[in-house]
Amino acid sequence: RYYSHRFYSFQAAAISENANTQSEQGVMLRVEAKPWEGVNIVSYVDFFADYWPRYGMTTSSNGQEFMLEGKFEMPHSHLLSLRYQMKRKAANDVILPLHRIKAQWTFTGFEKCKLQSTASVHLSSGTNPGFAVSQLAQASILRNRALRLSFVGAYFNAPDYLTRVYIYEPSLWNSSASYSYYGHGLRIATGISYTFPHSHWIIEAKYSLTHMLDRHTISSGHQEILSSNKNDISIQIRMEY
């Protein structure tokens, strides 16, 4: 896993820790099995090493990661997903194990509607666990699914950055859709996308609100918000051929 300092790609991904294009030594073994109809099991183990000090480190470091996930298709368009992930990675010259457990239920029984419920727990030594629960709803209406709507509501409680939780939410085209949170708060995001008929034009908009329950300010320095609420509005207009 070697990349020259002159290498750059806007949306590059690689088989490495966090899928980043970073120079490191590593070996990964991945196994996928379908023992029964409607059951899919995936597991991998990854060993990685950095011979140069990473951010927050003063020496070289190494780590291991293990993941086991099972997906179970059920009658009437129900899908249950269970995942366990363990990572041992050095931080501040100390190796700390991190455990992540995630359960997700998805319902696609309606032709143009999707419901998804997610619960996750993150555990680490020496700190309280972090957890999050979220509910996603998506719908497509009008002819040829020209109008698409989405909504996400989430509650999270993670004591520090080490046990931060990740929440997926539909986002604008070509932008990030998974965000990390720590602290105690609520997250709401809603989006709309419309494709003009007989045209190449598409307009998308997203509104999101983060409400913190454990503080009266958000961020710090020049980006400090003197409120427990953070509002974001994004609009995108694009033309496709």
Predicted regions and their residues:
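Exposed, low-structure sequence patches enriched in small/polar residues
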Residues: 1-241
